[in-house]
């Protein structure tokens, strides 16, 4: 009886095999991380393009505000992705911490005169074209 | 800024955030419910479901952000302040 139990335990059961389940969940999270990375890369490309255009047409202050907004948009998206990644595993709800990012951006633009509100908000929303491109390119 | 403008701005800010968060809140709840159910039924599709959920959340939450930005502009950078 005991030898049978030992034999069952040592056999290759995928439900008990921690390494194999880890590797399959690793593939799933890899897919999710790859999506995040693609959106991040697209947002960075759009940011570089927009900051260049804003600097050429509207000056340094507008392009700096756009850059700050775009960076805060990337940070917001990262926080949102982390909340969605935790959903169902370690958390039952998606946190709302990421909403503090636009709040701080608007407060900062009202506090610091170097930061223009409209370019900062437009920069913050630069993650949306990246999302739309990503959404359209999904199979 | 006179007192009527201040009061109207505060009321409008509250309405912008409150009313603007109702729809995305309901939508995010139902989307999260569907995604968690889908992951429980098909664990092998977890990555795709999470990715789609992330994109949907980003689109839905931007509506909340619009209301939030309008409210914050009304409170801290009011264009109607004389």
Swiss-Prot record, chain B:
GO terms for molecular function: lipid binding; proton-transporting ATP synthase activity, rotational mechanism. The record marks 61 as: Reversibly protonated during proton transport. Pfam families: ATP-synt_C (PF00137). The chain crosses the membrane at residues 7-27, 57-77. HAMAP family: ATP_synth_c_bact. Belongs to the ATPase C chain family. F(1)F(0) ATP synthase produces ATP from ADP in the presence of a proton or sodium gradient. F-type ATPases consist of two structural domains, F(1) containing the extramembraneous catalytic core and F(0) containing the membrane proton channel, linked together by a central stalk and a peripheral stalk. During catalysis, ATP synthesis in the catalytic domain of F(1) is coupled via a rotary mechanism of the central stalk subunits to proton translocation. This is ATP synthase subunit c. It comes from Prochlorococcus marinus (strain MIT 9211). The lineage of its organism: Bacteria, Bacillati, Cyanobacteriota, Cyanophyceae, Synechococcales. The gene is atpE.
């Amino acid at each position: 009886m005991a030898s049978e139990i030992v034999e069952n335990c040592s056999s290759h059961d995928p439900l008990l095999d921690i390494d194999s389940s880890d590797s399959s969940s690793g593939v799933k999270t890899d897919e999710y991380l790859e999506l995040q990375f693609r959106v991040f890369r697209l947002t960075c490309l759009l940011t570089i393009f927009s900051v260049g255009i804003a600097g050429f047409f509207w000056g340094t202050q507008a392009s700096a505000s756009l850059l700050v907004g775009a960076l805060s948009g990337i940070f917001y998206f990262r926080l949102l992705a982390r909340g969605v990644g935790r959903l169902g595993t370690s958390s039952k709800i998606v946190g709302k911490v990421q909403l503090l990012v636009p709040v701080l951006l608007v407060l900062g633009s009202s506090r610091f005169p170097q930061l223009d509100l409209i370019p900062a908000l437009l920069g913050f929303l630069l993650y949306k074209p990246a999302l739309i491109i990503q959404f359209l390119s999904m199979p | 800024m006179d007192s009527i403008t201040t009061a109207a701005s505060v009321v409008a800010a509250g309405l912008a955030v409150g009313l603007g968060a109702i729809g995305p809140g309901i939508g995010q709840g139902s989307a999260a419910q569907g995604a968690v159910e889908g992951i429980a039924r098909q664990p092998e599709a977890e990555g795709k479901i999470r990715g789609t959920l992330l994109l949907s959340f980003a689109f839905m939450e931007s509506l909340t952000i619009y209301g939030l930005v309008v409210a914050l502009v009304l409170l801290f950078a009011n264009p109607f302040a004389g």
